[in-house]
């Protein structure tokens, strides 16, 4: 029952956030400076209610593989309103595990990175909404 309620909450949040309009949320216009590093939530914290589904864990694994890319991506859950400055910010805490939009965007960014797309090209796809086609249940199994 808790899993169903959490899943419905994620879906509801996604629907509400998508309706926010055409504003492009905050993102960084270039990569991290050499020597700088931003942490993804440590693996030993990937448990509990925020990590009940395989796609939640997989989203964090992918975020850890492409931190420089997601640092340059906007996040359409509009978390810039709570101080986030890019999609990367979502995966520095459990925020990304609670938000279907964040997870879809990180799966999309990873797929496009594997296709050798540049961060600029990936960002354009995110702004177009290409990430909306991601199915979290099926994509987690294929990565």
Where do the model's predicted regions map?
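Short, flexible, mixed-charge glycine/proline-rich loop motifs
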Residues: 64-71
């Amino acid at each position: 029952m808790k899993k169903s309620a959490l899943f419905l909450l994620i879906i509801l949040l996604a629907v509400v956030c998508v309706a926010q309009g055409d504003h492009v949320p905050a993102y960084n216009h270039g990569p991290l400076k050499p020597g700088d590093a931003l942490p993804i939530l440590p693996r030993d914290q990937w448990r509990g209610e925020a990590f009940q589904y395989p796609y939640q864990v997989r989203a964090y694994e992918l975020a850890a593989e492409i931190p420089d890319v997601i640092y340059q991506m906007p996040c359409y859950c509009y978390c810039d309103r709570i101080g986030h400055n890019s999609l990367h910010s979502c995966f520095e805490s459990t925020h990304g595990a609670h938000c279907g939009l964040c997870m879809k965007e990180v799966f999309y960014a990873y797929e496009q990175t594997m296709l050798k797309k540049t961060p600029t090209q990936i960002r354009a796809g995110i702004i177009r909404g290409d990430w909306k086609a991601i199915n979290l249940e099926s994509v987690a199994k294929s990565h």
